Amino acid sequence: MHGLLLAGLAAALPLGVAGLPARQQSGLSPRGIDINPYRFASMAKYSEHKATSQMVHSFSYSKDDDYVATATKLVKSTFPNMTFRTVKDHYIGTNGIGHVHFKQTAHGIDIDNADFNVNIGRDGKVFTFGNSFYEGEMPKTNPLTKRDFSDPVKALHGAIKTLKLPVKPQSAKAMPMKEAETFKFEGTSGALSDPMAKLVYIQKDGKLHLTWRVETDVGDNWLLSYVDSKETETVHNVVDYVASADYKVFAWGLNDPTEGQPTMIKDPWNTTGTGSPFTWHGDGQMDYTVTRGNNIAAQDNPSGGEQWENNYRPDSPELSFVYEYNEQMEPEQYKDFAITQLFYTTNTFHDVLYSLGFTEEAGNFQMNNNGKGGEGNDFAICNAQDGSGTNNANFATPPDGQNGRMRMYTWTTAQPSRDGDLEAGIVIHEYTHGLSNRLCGGPANSNCLTELEAGGMGEGWGDFYATAIRLKQDDTHDTDYTMGEWAANMQGGIREYPYSTNMQTNPYTYADVQGMDEVHGIGTVWATILYEVLWNLIDEHGMSKNIMPKFVNGAPSDGRNLAMKLVLDGMTLMPCNPNFMQARDAIIDADQALTNGQNKCALMKAFSKRGLGANYKHGKTRVNNFDMPADC
């Protein structure tokens, strides 16, 4: 567990633990179709691993069963009087977990929002499961016998009229497909593909309703409209395959409320890359309307306890996370805003780091690794306004396959109190502990930053990434930055010196580590050195204003992202529990691997300036060396 220690604040702050430092209106959406009145209610139940192991231990499955058979037995045991079918998408993930999905049926007709998913562990036992099966009264008669439902063409007209879809049915004809009671419409215009219809049940308000599921792809909206099978101008529910979300937050690059105002951010996930293929609100199996998804589960935790699953999260069926904040409010009054900000910052950092190389195989934090390696099932649990402390923050990093945990605290250093969730630098610092602990020594070993100097670098990396990300386009080599200044309400921040390339402003060199006996001071020295690295590379390659890096021949084309990439790659190369010299060498090696050593001299200029010169010899006593390599 790591925190962001407030150096020099022992007398000023009541530290209990070691540590750091208008709602959008519903209506016509910008994408054209307002589906909010038609969204399905949430009915899913989920049994996590601990609960599952206690619930299903009495089940006895034959050793001859494959994982699909085992999953099927669980469903039959849970709902012995119900009918269902196995969905043909079962697979075994790279983490060894088998995934099987089932659809409930009635009279051979799908209940479209009644599902059961079973996950089978490597040992052949049920690992977890979830379901939304309908448990009410089933229809007594088979509707296919009487066929007292409307023609599918009428359902298409009903969907178009009720939802005002930009589709012209003209002389639409329903052409039967191979699947029973499934049709494709010919003779329409306005949709990107021929509309479709399928007869299905849905569960709503405790009852089953027979509907035509009308599928229309109109570009900005790809809709499944559930039209009543008899009253075809009644649309019960609508699903949109095109996900959209709005967040009112301090945008990426704004470190805290002193640097700007909250703004509306739309669909920020990096779906054009591969960092968040399920957006931020899905994990490939479940979609959420709260601040939870494949990468992050963000919630409040006022009690400070270990439980998080059922803690409060903002919930928006329309994915409009728009809440108010002003500096006169107490943290409790803006907890929705704070949780949303934490969710936004951590997800954005996840996507940035993914582009730089912190992927599934490298041990990143994701529930579903989507077949790309690594252990999975280990998204980051991020607690906002955690009640277990104040004036601090921390992050716990177990090995790959187990959840990381971030605890963000309120700060009693100002009136009203301030929320660390609103200072991006603190959030980024903490998440970087997860990065460095997963990369140094490999994702299966979280014990490679335990020695004093190595642990100090763990703190320094956090400050480095926090500072690199907050740089502004008009900053120069002479720009200085502090850490934790807003949250701590402390001019000059919580470190001994601000981060600066000016030796008078920040005189730290490697030799200063000699007299230090705690990780945060050592970390400030390491981050000071990396700040020199950062600006030398920006001076060489410029600084992009884009959130995501642009790559040329595999390397970021701008200096800021190149620095973040080389530092990250260096973590993967260095030994378990490295010292400064080994970390320096690993960064140089990372540049050799990435750019064939094009930046060696710019890097060594930074290291030698702060005492880690070419002729430095590591020993019990740290003595500065300011020499440059002969070939520079």
From Swiss-Prot:
UniProt binding sites for Zn(2+): H429, H433
Cited function: Secreted metalloproteinase probably acting as a virulence factor.
Pfam families in the cross-refs: FTP, Peptidase_M36
Co-factor binding details: Binds 1 zinc ion per subunit.
Record's subcellular location: Secreted
GO biological process assignments: proteolysis
A single GO cellular-component term on record: extracellular region
CDD domains membership: M36
Residues carrying a glycan: N81, N270
Name under which the protein is recorded: Probable extracellular metalloproteinase 2
Enzyme Commission (EC) number: 3.4.24.-
Positions annotated as propeptide: 20-244
Active site: E430
Keywords tagged on the record: Glycoprotein, Hydrolase, Metal-binding, Metalloprotease, Protease, Secreted, Signal, Virulence, Zinc, Zymogen
Domain of life per record: Eukaryota
GO molecular function: metalloendopeptidase activity; zinc ion binding
Family label: Belongs to the peptidase M36 family.
Cofactors demanded by this protein: Zn(2+)
Signal peptide: 1-19
Main location: secreted
